[in-house]
């Protein structure tokens, strides 16, 4: 049923020769579409309908204008995220902030949040376990990819603060230095 609805929507868009490019934001958050399906539709909107990969959406009472890349990150649609990067969607500071905040949320979800800018003994113990190590490795791979796509290393201020609280800022500093060196070499 979801495929039929999507096909009808796309045919209607083509017939009217007008595509509402902001629909890409809805496609990304559509829980009925897999990541692979979403990436396919996003590619179609950009390549065939001429939508801008760098479009943003205005949200009242919010000073930033999130882009498609941020939506794909928040929806945890990695294939869609990679498709957007390949289509030239710009990385921005608010995406880096979201990545930093995801560390704080991850700690809180695991019952070991940061309180009053201090790491509890439980948090310091938690960061030794495999679950955290895998989470950190996944996020650092993402950061490396974003640096390769032009992310400014200075955008990771929030993450630096969080990692400093748990005495892990050196790993990030090394990653950001390596990314900056590659940027200078290009």
How should each PLM-predicted stretch be described?
Residues 1-18:
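Classical Sec-dependent N-terminal signal peptides that target proteins to the secretory pathway
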Residues 158-186:
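Terminal, low-structured helical/coil segments at or just beyond the last alpha-helical repeat
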Residues 16-44, 149, 181:
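N-terminal export/targeting and maturation segments
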Residues 50-51, 88-89, 112, 151, ...:
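Ankyrin-repeat C-terminal turn/loop position
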């Amino acid at each position: 049923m979801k495929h039929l609805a999507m096909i009808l929507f796309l045919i209607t868009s083509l017939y009217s020769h007008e595509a509402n490019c902001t629909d890409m934001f809805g496609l990304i958050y559509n829980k009925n579409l897999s990541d692979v399906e979403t990436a396919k539709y996003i590619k179609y909107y950009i390549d065939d309908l001429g939508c801008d990969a760098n479009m943003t959406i205005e949200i009242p009472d919010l000073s930033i204008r999130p882009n498609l890349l941020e939506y794909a990150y928040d929806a945890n649609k990695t294939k869609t995220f990679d498709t957007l990067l390949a289509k030239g969607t710009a990385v921005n500071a608010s995406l880096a902030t979201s990545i930093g905040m995801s560390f704080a949320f991850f700690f809180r979800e695991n019952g070991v949040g940061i309180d009053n800018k201090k790491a509890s003994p439980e948090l310091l113990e938690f960061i030794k376990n495999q679950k955290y190590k895998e989470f950190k490795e996944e996020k650092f791979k993402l950061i490396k990819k974003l640096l390769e796509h032009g992310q400014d290393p200075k955008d990771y201020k929030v993450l630096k603060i969080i990692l400093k609280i748990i005495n892990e800022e050196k790993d990030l500093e090394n990653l950001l230095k390596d990314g900056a060196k590659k940027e200078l070499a290009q």
